[in-house]
Amino acid sequence: MTVNIYDDANQMATNLQTLPQFLGLQNAFAALKKDDIAFTMFKKFQTQQMTLQQKQMQGEELTDDEIQEIQELAQKIGDIDAIKNLMEQERQLSQLMDELNQIISKPIADIYQG
């Protein structure tokens, strides 16, 4: 019997889209997009976060001003209900993905522990 692991992965991706954790994230993001101010702040935060991560990956030090700016923006967006809901939905989906990764990776871990 030949196993096509990619078929299994594609089926898993399809199944994922029906789970409450995925649907919750999808709905939370749709709600966020309807709030122009919150969505604009969210996108600004994402852009700044990406810029700072790239800078760090290139071995550059972040300035105190950059750190303060991203912290202030994070605090502002953290007070917005639509963003809080999105973050909670992301956390729930991330927890599920971590559990799935542990299941999938178990045979590899078993090799090293055996």
Swiss-Prot record:
Disulfide bonds: none annotated. SUPFAM superfamilies: YheA/YmcA-like. InterPro entries: Com_YlbF, YheA/YmcA-like_dom_sf. Signal peptide: none annotated. HAMAP family: UPF0342 (MF_01526). Belongs to the UPF0342 family. This is UPF0342 protein LCA_0622. It comes from Latilactobacillus sakei subsp. sakei (strain 23K) (Lactobacillus sakei subsp. sakei). The lineage of its organism: Bacteria, Bacillati, Bacillota, Bacilli, Lactobacillales.
